[in-house]
A protein has these predicted regions:
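Gly/Gly-Pro- and Ser/Thr-rich, intrinsically disordered tail segments characteristic of DNA damage-repair
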Residues: 1-215, 219-222, 338, 342-355
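DNA-contacting surface of Y-family translesion DNA polymerases
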Residues: 8, 181, 189-333, 338-354
């Protein structure tokens, strides 16, 4: 049995909450953090805006239609990074085993905690109180014996909540959950599972491992483990992101020249994610999967780091043109990614050397 004590801390509507904290006029108002424009996407939405159906990564024009009276605020990433640093300093008071996932969430391994608090639940409660008292922001937290369960737990009582999944209660907790609550289970996989009568995590647990592996390959093994509350992945402090990518599965297979809008949307999503993590990338990657499940990748490394959403989009579309196939070939998945990251500090120093 896993005896670790893992906490997942997730700042509630982080960017929007920072804006509301710093401007009293925004408190209680629906706030959408996004650039205005036809191709922009929502970076964050306050809970007041979410009541109208606004969600992160939604096209900004759609968000404006759903909530026309919302206040649109352009993102201020330097300010968010500064607040995120303050949050991390609070987390590090309790353990050195802190794995940031983004500016607004992190995993902590508090199996041994610096403050000698008697339980992981007490550590999580203290962290939330310190964030509230020192930064005037709300955070949700989940406590469990592994990262997978802790993440589900932190979502359970949002916003501004704390939830604990005890080891002997994990299976009972997971059993009735819909399959889409499992990481990696999107619309397409949910549909495939539904077609074979699988709708809940408990249904997955009742399937033989061989059936899951036959249907979903290596991820079938992962589903088998998750349905049993198993996750051996360690908390990895300072683990660098190797790549940032996004992909989409079409409802029906499409021709190559019908992928423009999807590539642009994915490029916007990837660019926003790289900005959120303050990452500087040198390589742009395009991924395509044919209707016959053949995977094609094309990449390009410009002479200087990728500097804008427009550059990312132009290069991704150009990479598509390098795909030489029968014009009648159809595709089921397209993806856009950034990789070959550089340290922003080193990059800035190198730029200065050559000015």
């Amino acid at each position: 049995m896993d005896t670790r004590k893992i906490i997942h801390v997730d700042m509630d509507a982080f960017y929007a909450s920072v804006e509301q904290r710093d401007d009293p006029n925004l408190r209680g108002a629906p706030v959408i953090v996004a650039w205005r424009g036809k191709r922009s996407v929502v970076c964050a939405a306050s809970y007041e805006a979410r009541k109208f159906g606004v969600r992160s990564a939604m096209p900004a024009v759609q968000a404006e239609r759903l909530c026309p009276h919302a206040v649109f605020i352009p993102p201020d990433f330097p300010r968010y990074r500064a607040v995120s640093k303050s949050v991390r300093e609070i987390l590090l008071r309790h353990t050195d085993l802190v794995e940031p996932l983004s500016l607004d969430e992190a995993y902590l391994d508090v199996t041994e905690n610096k403050t000698r608090l008697p339980s992981a639940t007490e550590v999580a409660r203290t962290i939330r109180e310190q964030i509230r008292q020192e930064l005037n922001l709300a955070a949700s937290a989940g406590v469990a014996t592994n990262k997978f369960l802790a993440k589900i737990a932190s979502d359970w009582r949002k916003p501004d909540g704390l939830f604990v999944i005890k080891p002997d209660e994990a299976i009972a907790f997971l059993t009735p959950l819909p399959v889409e609550r499992l990481p990696g289970v999107g619309k397409v996989m949910t549909q495939k599972l539904t077609e074979v009568g699988v709708r809940t995590v408990g249904d997955i647990r009742n399937l033989d491992l061989a059936i899951l592996q036959n249907q979903f390959g290596r991820y079938g093994t992962r589903l088998h483990e998750l349905a049993r509350g198993m996750d051996n992945n360690p908390v990895e402090p300072n683990r660098p992101t190797q790549s940032i990518s996004a992909e989409d599965t079409f409802e029906s297979d499409v021709l190559l020249n019908e992928t423009d809008a999807t590539i642009r949307r994915l490029a916007e999503k990837v660019w926003q994610a790289s900005r959120k993590e303050s990452r500087i990338a040198r390589t742009i990657v395009l991924k395509l999967k044919t209707a016959e499940f053949t995977i094609l990748t094309r990449s390009h490394t410009p002479s200087s780091p990728v500097s804008s959403f427009e550059e990312l989009t132009i290069v991704a579309l150009a990479l598509r043109e390098k795909v030489q196939m029968n014009p009648r070939q159809r595709f089921r998945i397209v993806g856009v990614g950034l990789s070959n990251f550089r340290d922003p500090i080193i990059e800035s120093a190198e730029d200065l050397l050559f000015e």
